[in-house]
């Protein structure tokens, strides 16, 4: 869990220069500025990936929990919006301690969500609508209810070393203690004593989520088998969860103190140099990439099978996931979380430009950028940046070069529901934190049910009680209302996806500048096509903008997309030298000769 931070302009420039200097062999400005000249762009390279959190998306049977039939019923909505790929948060069999991230059977569907027949129907329906399905794959750990763990705890020879087991140590009073000072991401020791086995097992997350031992070739083979099982079911790839936690130092040394906190049970108490981002992780990424490439080659009738990887890690680590120094390729899409972790509602225009340039400049040649604006683990866009910024942030997301990732509900500007009571709180870290502190860490606010309409439970479910409370603002903030409105966040989002079909946004050159501390702009240019300019005001005040220097000469602009509160309208002609942007406004324009 990376903490958001702000950098001074001087620090940013020094870091950017450092990145360029230390990575001299990498293409610097070419990946940032040059047009993509290839005739072929693979299906995923310009896709909008729409993350569905199934438990909160749509309930089809009235039990208060979203399910696969609910997802199937809403696939036409995704197709109508223009979505061509969706990744589903975990749907595998699970005790639901961490709501699917504690898997008890990788080859079965969670009973609450449906059956394997439902999943097969989902894939077939999605395929008929031109939508590809990506599954969330959780390899770092299983549930403690998984058959593998039960057999490992019993020292079954075939599963004895499937997990990370270790003896404890005795303190001066002869009391048994964990092997070292490693902490769980969810708070507390990362070690849990198992009475039957007579050893501790490692759990980097909840104690019900024991870590698998990827140094055991049998574990790797078992996970390969899981991937092949779902590939044969027709999925187009996987999003790999918590990737950088896969390996730990075998000698189990104490981790050095970070100095960030005096609480020895806090995850921030130590520097995680022995439990995260070990070199072996990269080898596993490359192994899985080869598996996917081999599968694609053997099944030429299907599209490229891809890997998306989740890791809150240093930039160099993420770039190596793309391709290492020896040219070995890994993840097609190492998730770029900079819009989540490195900018906020307090950021100025230079912060945004810096974080965009940093990824594009550092990315190895021949790879595809990606931009994740939100997910199920972090506050929503409307909460992080403010409701007035929703359209501008979606304009940013959908006109940058490469892949865009949208969390369900962001197209409406859904907001976190921060008033969930302690009694209704279900998120594991929040429950561990306790009644006084749960709101500081709970992920429940961003996971509330999708707001389809102003009907009971926002049209999500007919149940008397839903698994999480519905945000009360659904009465005014819902899809049905936004479809009927003259202007709405949803209509802006849909128009942006339509705009993305233009060759200039698929293959155009890219350049970006901060025009001031409060406004930045970028343009996409391609020979024989109109240039598009995206302008964003990140401040809470109206700004007068002169684009003349940025576009090299005075020109007229034609508005392509404007936000819901904008005074401008699509098709309107305006001057490049005297453009007024209201607070948090974004605008996309086409250039005309003066």
Swiss-Prot record:
Residue numbers marked as site, Transition state stabilizer: 377
Pfam family of the protein (one): Alpha-amylase
Enzyme class: hydrolase
Xref: InterPro entries: Glyco_hydro_13_cat_dom, Glyco_hydro_b, Glycoside_hydrolase_SF, O16G_dom_2
Residues annotated as glycosylated: 140, 454, 537, 546
GO molecular function, one term: alpha-1,4-glucosidase activity
Keyword terms: Glycoprotein, Glycosidase, Hydrolase, Signal
Annotated GO biological process: carbohydrate metabolic process
Domain of life: Eukaryota
Catalytic activity: Hydrolysis of terminal, non-reducing (1->4)-linked alpha-D-glucose residues with release of alpha-D-glucose
Active-site residues, as the UniProt record annotates them: 241 (nucleophile), 310 (proton donor)
Segment forming the signal sequence: 1-30
EC number of this enzyme: 3.2.1.20
Family recorded in the similarity comment: Belongs to the glycosyl hydrolase 13 family.
Stated name of the protein: Maltase 2
Underlying gene: Mal-B2
């Amino acid at each position: 869990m990376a903490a958001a931070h702000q950098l001074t302009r001087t620090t940013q420039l020094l870091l950017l220069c450092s990145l360029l200097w230390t990575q001299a062999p990498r293409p610097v400005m070419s990946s940032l500025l040059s047009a993509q000249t290839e005739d072929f762009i693979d299906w995923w390279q310009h896709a909008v990936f729409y993350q569905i959190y199934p438990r909160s998306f749509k309930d089809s049977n009235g039990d208060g929990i979203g399910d696969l039939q609910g997802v199937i019923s809403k696939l036409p909505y995704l197709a109508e919006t223009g979505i061509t790929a969706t990744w589903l948060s975990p749907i595998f069999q699970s005790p639901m301690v961490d709501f699917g991230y504690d898997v008890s059977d990788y080859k079965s569907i969670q009973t609450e969500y449906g059956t394997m027949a439902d999943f097969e129907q989902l894939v077939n329906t999605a395929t008929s609508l031109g939508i590809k399905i990506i599954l969330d794959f959780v390899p770092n750990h299983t549930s403690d209810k998984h058959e593998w763990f039960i057999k490992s705890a019993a020292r079954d020879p075939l599963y004895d070393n499937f997990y990370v087991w270790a003896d404890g140590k005795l303190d001066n009073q002869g009391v048994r203690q964990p092997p070292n000072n490693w902490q769980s991401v969810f708070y507390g020791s990362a070690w849990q004593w198992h009475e039957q086995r007579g050893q501790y097992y490692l759990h980097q997350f909840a104690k019900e989520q024991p870590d698998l031992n990827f140094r055991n070739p049998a574990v790797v083979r078992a996970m390969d088998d899981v991937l092949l099982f779902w590939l044969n079911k027709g999925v187009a790839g996987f999003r790999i969860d918590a990737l950088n936690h896969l390996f730990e130092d075998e000698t189990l040394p104490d981790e050095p103190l970070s100095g960030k906190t005096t609480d020895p049970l806090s995850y921030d108490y130590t520097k995680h140099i022995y439990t995260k981002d070990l070199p072996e992780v990269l080898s596993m990424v490359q192994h899985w990439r080869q598996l996917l490439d081999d599968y694609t080659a053997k099944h030429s009738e299907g599209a490229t099978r891809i890997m998306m990887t989740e890791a809150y890690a240093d930039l160099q680590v993420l770039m190596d996931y793309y391709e290492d120094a020896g040219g070995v390729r890994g993840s097609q899409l190492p998730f770029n979380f900079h819009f989540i972790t490195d900018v906020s509602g307090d950021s100025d225009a230079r912060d945004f430009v810096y974080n965009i340039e940093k990824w594009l400049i550092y990315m190895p040649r021949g790879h595809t950028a990606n931009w994740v604006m939100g997910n199920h683990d972090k506050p929503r866009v409307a909460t992080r940046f403010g409701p007035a910024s929703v359209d501008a942030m979606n304009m940013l997301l959908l006109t940058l070069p490469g892949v865009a990732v949208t969390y369900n509900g962001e197209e409406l500007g859904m907001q976190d529901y921060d008033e969930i009571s302690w009694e209704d709180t279900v998120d594991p870290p929040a429950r561990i934190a306790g009644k006084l502190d749960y709101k500081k860490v709970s992920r429940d606010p961003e996971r509330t049910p999708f707001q389809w309409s102003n009907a009971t439970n926002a049209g999500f479910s007919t149940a008397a009680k839903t698994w999480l409370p519905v945000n009360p603002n659904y009465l005014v903030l819902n899809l049905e209302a936004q479809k009927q409105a003259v202007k709405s966040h949803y209509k802006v989002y849909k128009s942006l996806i339509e705009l993305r079909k233009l060759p200039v946004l698929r293959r155009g050159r890219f350049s970006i500048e901060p025009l001031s501390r409060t406004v930045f702009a970028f343009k996409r240019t391609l020979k024989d096509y109109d240039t598009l300019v995206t302008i964003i005001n990140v401040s809470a005040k109206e700004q007068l903008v002169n684009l003349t220097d940025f576009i090299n000469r005075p020109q007229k602009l034609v508005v392509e997309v404007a936000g819901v509160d904008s005074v401008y309208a699509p098709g309107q002609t305006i001057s490049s030298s005297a453009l007024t942007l209201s607070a948090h406004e974004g605008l996309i324009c086409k250039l005309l000769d003066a």
